[in-house]
């Protein structure tokens, strides 16, 4: 039987047989997903993006100005928490691979089970305990818990793509819906959180004597009323986002049905985790996809994390950076349907090269200091970011299907593929942020100065222009050797449909 499973070279079939197989495969394929199901699936990914955006923009300033812990302690909380979040990705993938199929699926119980604890940990992350000694341990514990539980939600959610439908086009469409809502969630997280906590960061409680960093004692003094109010608005924002988690997981559970995929000829035979991890990391298309998008994701992360600093210290755009950030995110949201149409029309590899739009416009922003140019660059960056977000999650199911075809005897590796991809993405983002911050340290960045030195300005220009451009070029060069084309993708889809038909037929005969 194992030998039969590998005898699937479609080139040996006659044209009439191939047409017959296509008709039979199309009839055997699962019903297409409704728009409502795709929307419900997409909504399930929104809260993680909202909370991630809120914490990315405001957690550091909250720890320093509201929780009143030292910068060293804040860096400890952020770095260790993110590292722990990355470590939990393969752990969650391993646990999911060992999970049994239940009445509501294999992935849905994970999301339902972790959501209440995720909400509690997120809320307590934005709560200031009464004790001061050891307060850093409070935030380290709950930020680590939040990162781990967020992973326990995100890994099964992204893996769910493989169990929505056996039709690759439907999965791609669901991914486009998901990425649209997730980018919209990022926009909402940055905008809504900013509006709620804006009063916590006004300058009315500070008295700055000059622009050289010499501050009066009044600037260092934090009135009790201000601190109390600031802590309250942050808790209100955390409560709203926590309620959003509960609402979205309810929509996901009620609107999406997880479907098992009978692609394996030996039903229920699961490859052990470490063996499966070794096999996935030796799979050529997966390594190619990871290598290319690690560089591309790191490039996007470097540019995003240094954009506000660049606007403030290197481009004289400090009064416009918030609007520029919103422009980037809005452009990304609006362009995702375009990229979905483009990849269906011209192929995913061709669409991936749309990421290169970021290169000339970023260089233009560095060399031409103009508000109009900055907004043009923001729109172009939004287009590129949308492509970089959509394409890896659209291409990853194709890699998994290709692996299924060449390894039809085992099941349960989908979570390993997805968790490993998320792990390496987080790892690359962490390394990129560490290197960019370290480069600013070498350039003698001084937090007490309103006007930085020329070396800092030059470093920021390199971090916004040259460094991301080089990484994107290398990443796209690697992606050019990605072996899965549109033709091979369709051949794989047909071959898997044949396996599914045989599996269903053998099951009916046994029954």
From Swiss-Prot:
Membrane protein topology class: Multi-pass membrane protein
Family: Belongs to the major facilitator superfamily.
Keyword field: Cell membrane, Lipid transport, Membrane, Transmembrane, Transmembrane helix, Transport
Subcellular location(s) per record: Cell membrane
One family name in Pfam for this protein: MFS_2
Molecular-function GO term, any one: symporter activity
Biological process according to GO: carbohydrate transport; lipid transport; positive regulation of platelet aggregation; sphingosine-1-phosphate receptor signaling pathway
UniProt key word Ribosomal protein: no
SUPFAM superfamilies: MFS general substrate transporter
Residue ranges crossing the lipid bilayer per the database entry: 108-128, 136-156, 236-256, 280-300, 323-343, 357-377, 379-399, 415-435, 462-482
Function: Lipid transporter that specifically mediates export of sphingosine-1-phosphate in red blood cells and platelets. Sphingosine-1-phosphate is a signaling sphingolipid and its export from red blood cells into in the plasma is required for red blood cell morphology. Sphingosine-1-phosphate export from platelets is required for platelet aggregation and thrombus formation. In addition to export, also able to mediate S1P import.
Keyword Transmembrane found: yes
Protein name listed in UniProt: Sphingosine-1-phosphate transporter MFSD2B
Catalytic activity: sphing-4-enine 1-phosphate(in) = sphing-4-enine 1-phosphate(out); sphinganine 1-phosphate(in) = sphinganine 1-phosphate(out); sphinga-4E,14Z-dienine-1-phosphate(in) = sphinga-4E,14Z-dienine-1-phosphate(out)
Gene3D superfamilies according to UniProt: MFS general substrate transporter like domains (1.20.1250.20)
